[in-house]
Amino acid sequence: MKKIKRPDLEKIKNIKRPNSFTFILYMCRLVFRGLILLAAVYLYFAHRDLLVSFVRDDFLRTFDWRHVIWLVLMFGMIIHILPAKFITMGSRKSSLNTYTEPTAHYDSDELYRFVQIMNVKAWKVMLIWLCFNAVFAVLYLFGVIGNAEMLLLSFLYFVSDMICILIFCPFQSLIMKNRCCVNCRIFDWGHFMIYTPLLFIKSFFSWSLFFTACIVLIRWEVIYASHPERFWHGSNTTLQCENCKDRICQIKQPLKEMYRHISKNIQDYLK
């Protein structure tokens, strides 16, 4: 198998740019979410009753550590509804105040084609996600798994969401094919995906999170349908690489470049 040539290695190294505030913030969020998942795993094996207490009827009777977790999770969605200035442009691009129209006139037909292609890909992702989670839903409804397992699954998705943003996203690589998260058509679908397992648990904790996530999703889709020009780099120069201030692709892009070269070398070797 061929080795990656030195010029290619230099190209991979040169992808890295100075860390931005957004990148550092999201790395901290990844660590924080990882700690929450570890705590949930610990509770699952050591004190499962405490984990299940999130979805019990006494959740609203007293204020304790469970409500702090709930507030943190809810806050994570509220900042996407507003949206807050410190989150990535991947979410904020839906707002009018982040839209920058190009000086040269863009092709409306090309924008329309972009919308059509991205919509088809987006609903493929939705279909795959619903089918995948339908497996857990059936297991839950037949009593094979319970509330604790569904909560743990949701916390796993909670971490996976940030991994998709910073490190690797299978939906981006295999289906959407967008060049980065800032340009992602389904960026604000994340919370809906995170809390999908909670739909099947009848409690204030689970349903408040799931249906708030639905509001985030619906808001995103309404804006996308009304103002698609905000979501395409050809009609919104804010989304172009040279204007990016987030730089949250610092890990993902070098990995993509490395994977591309390895794949090419494997193909050349098999010829």
Placement of each model-derived feature along the sequence:
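Cytosolic-side membrane-entry/anchor segment at the start of a transmembrane helix
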Residues: 2-45, 94-110, 177-183
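Long, highly hydrophobic alpha-helical transmembrane signal-anchor segments
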Residues: 18-73, 120-139
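Hydrophobic alpha-helical membrane-embedded segments
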Residues: 33-46, 58-93, 141-144, 151, ...
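Charge-rich cytosolic interhelical loops and cytosolic tails of multi-pass membrane proteins
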Residues: 79-122, 265
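Juxtamembrane/interface segments at transmembrane-helix termini
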Residues: 82-95, 167-174, 220-238
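Membrane-helix boundary/juxtamembrane motif in polytopic membrane proteins
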Residues: 167-192
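Hydrophobic alpha-helical transmembrane segments in multi-pass integral membrane proteins
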Residues: 189-206
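Short, highly charged, low-complexity non-transmembrane loops/tails of multi-pass membrane proteins
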Residues: 226-271
